[in-house]
Amino acid sequence: MNKKLFILALGAAMTAVSCQERNKNVIDPEVDLIGDITEDRILEEGQTYTLTGGLHVKEGATLTIEPGVTIIAQDDNQVDYILIEQGAKIDARGTASAPIVMTSNRKEAGAWGGLHICGKAPINAGTDAKSEIGDASYGGNDPADNSGVLQYIRVEYGGFTFSEEKEANGFTFYGVGNGTTVDHLQAYGGSDDGFEWFGGTVNVKYLISTNNTDDSFDWTEGWCGNGQFMIAQQISEECDALIEADNNDNDNMAEPISHPVLSNLTLVGNGADGRGIRLRAGTQAEIYNTIVTGKSRALTTETEGTESALANGTSKLQYIYLSSGVSSDNEEGSVLYDQNDFLANDNHNEVGYTAQLTNSIMGTIDGGLDASGIDSFFDNAAYAGALPSGNDWTSGWALTADGGSTGGATVELEGDITEDMTLQAGVNYTLIGGLHVKEGATLTIEPGTVITAQDDDIVDYLLIEQGAKIDARGTADNPIVMTSERKEAGSWGGLHICGKAPINAGSGAKSEIGDASYGGNDPHDNSGTLQYIRVEYGGYAFSEEKEANGFTFYGVGNGTTVDHL
């Protein structure tokens, strides 16, 4: 055999061995996932697997999860979870078009135990720390420890409750080192935290915590990693803090002291009472280029160690935009950091910011810190916020807050709105009748939202009644569009605003559409804001004498803002 033929034969033999090795390592989708993995194993691309208990990847073994794999936790009496132990690895590389999905057959918060990684990086919880789930050791002396790769993964419906004190998160990092690659992860619809770090040095990018009913992001026990492009979005009234940050509850000054460096965050609360960013228990932090909205207490500080670090510059909060104020809950002594410190000129911070975000999370504020000057891990993104318009890194692999793909869900609009409601861009809204915003309620319509009237036998229209408000602030780049499936004049009934300003038609005046009262004695009545809105194909004919306009203003007062329509 000549040399060329020998090489070809050797290559073919090696390929055959390689295929045999892979086939040996691939787990059959018919086999339930439970117990210990002690050798390298593969979950094959595009396959669906069933998790029926705790799955531990043991030291020396690697679990490879290929793109498009779905793992479904069984709704049974077992505690289902996946745990990567110290010295083991996970190689889970999904893609934007084929994410890895870990979910449950019971589509409810708290259905299963989530994904847990245990590493050998430093923590401040002692030498015998054990994971809250699986009783696995974590922590050590190797900040560069490598637990593998996590990319384009969605964990849904985590947060299994073990006791009143212990619930499993979506993603949990126990002493994970910065040799581990972590980006493009979403924790969706869980009953505990979306993401939690127990010490470690792991760096993270492109994280989304969506409607997790405890904290969106949580750290403790000395986490000292970096994070960039992180989104929290809360809908449920049960949701707690957007960020809950601790060093160590038992010893606030335990070392290493938690000191993550974070940039480009968009944190959107549920509009209820509660905290946005909660810094406490001695934690330090550097947070830059961040938007916080939807919480009555956007930033709170607690404990002397935490406030001292802010006051002396060890911790830094810069280029941060808060919808509400800064408050101290420090019960250990005098307040060491307050809103005046937060608003100092060199911090470039703002309180009272009104968010102009598309789909609740998309949008940025120009101007910010180039965090790449702090560490090469960071991209140069000198703006506040995580998701710039025109660069939707969530597209295709993540879910929206209502469970639709980021390509857009469909929601029907009809009847009465009696409480504040927000229409989000990216969601397909179909108007299938009269939509009345009732007294005391505000309808907020975000930039870029499209409302489409259905082509049917029902009269479709949108009406803001007396005492109600509309807050519809489109932009030149992202106007609000109200249109019809049937692209013809007279297809639907248009937009109608009823106010309490003077009219000369008497005290019993009613709108031509919707039979709503209008007129009064308040020339300064305020029905809200209308900016950059396009109404298309209005003018529905009720009779020979009555047709609906595009925009109709019934006794609207001059407290209302109207432009660019």
Regions of interest found by a model, annotated:
Residues 30-63, 74-89, 94, 99-192, ...:
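Extracellular beta-rich repeat passengers
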Residues 71-72, 449-452:
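Active/ligand-binding-proximal structured segments within catalytic/core domains
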Residues 2-6, 11-34, 405-407:
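Bacterial Sec-dependent N-terminal signal peptides
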